[in-house]
Regions:
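Alpha-helical oligomerization segments with coiled-coil/rod-like character
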Residues: 1-29
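Catalytic cores of peptidoglycan-degrading enzymes
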Residues: 27-159
C-alpha cells in the first residue's frame, strides 16, 4: 500500500498530456511507442522492490518485456547524444529531441547507432536484449524532461 501511495504521489508531479490515445503504432504527445507492437509492462515507473538488489528503490522508466532481437524504435526524432555501455543499463542509447526532452533505451545487445547520428521517429535504433542488470530480455525506456525523468506512459500509449 505504501508503494502504491508513493507512486500515486509521484505521478501527480509529472507533467501529463491531455487524453490522446492510439494504437501501438501511434503517437501520444509527439512520442511514438518504442516497439513495433504492444507488449507487457514487466516493471512500472516509480518506487518498487528492485528485482536484483531486493531493495526499495526508484525505477526511472518503464520496462517492456519483449523477445530478444525485437526492433527498438526512436520514440521521436532527434540526435543521439549517448551510445554506450554501463553496468546497470548494459548497452544503451540516449536521444535528444530538443525542447528539453530526451529518451533512453537500455539493455540492448549492442549499440546500433552512434553519437551524433540524427534519427527519425519510428527508425530502428537498436534491438531488445538483456545486458547490464537484467533478469531477461526487455526494453528499459525512460523519457526525461529538462533533465528529470517523467513517466513515459504519460507520453506514449500501449492501446
Amino acid at each position: 500500500e505504501r508503494i502504491a501511495a508513493l507512486n500515486r504521489q509521484n505521478n501527480n508531479k509529472v507533467p501529463s498530456n491531455s487524453g490522446n490515445s492510439g494504437s501501438a503504432a501511434s503517437s501520444t504527445g509527439g512520442f511514438l511507442y518504442p516497439l513495433p507492437y504492444a507488449v507487457s509492462i514487466t516493471d512500472a515507473y516509480g518506487y518498487r522492490i528492485h528485482p536484483l538488489t531486493k531493495k526499495y528503490s526508484w525505477h526511472n522508466g518503464v520496462d517492456f518485456g519483449a523477445a530478444a532481437g525485437t526492433a527498438i524504435l526512436a520514440a521521436k526524432s532527434g540526435t543521439v547524444t549517448t551510445a554506450a555501455y554501463s553496468g546497470a543499463w548494459g548497452y544503451y542509447v540516449v536521444i535528444n529531441h530538443g525542447d528539453g526532452y530526451s529518451s533512453l533505451y537500455a539493455h540492448q545487445p549492442s549499440c546500433s547507432v552512434s553519437v551524433g547520428d540524427y534519427v527519425t521517429q519510428g527508425q530502428t535504433i537498436g534491438y531488445v536484449g538483456s545486458t547490464g542488470w537484467s533478469t531477461g530480455p526487455h526494453l528499459h525506456f525512460t523519457i526525461y524532461y529538462n533533465g528529470s525523468d517523467v513517466n513515459p506512459l504519460n507520453y506514449v500509449s500501449m492501446s
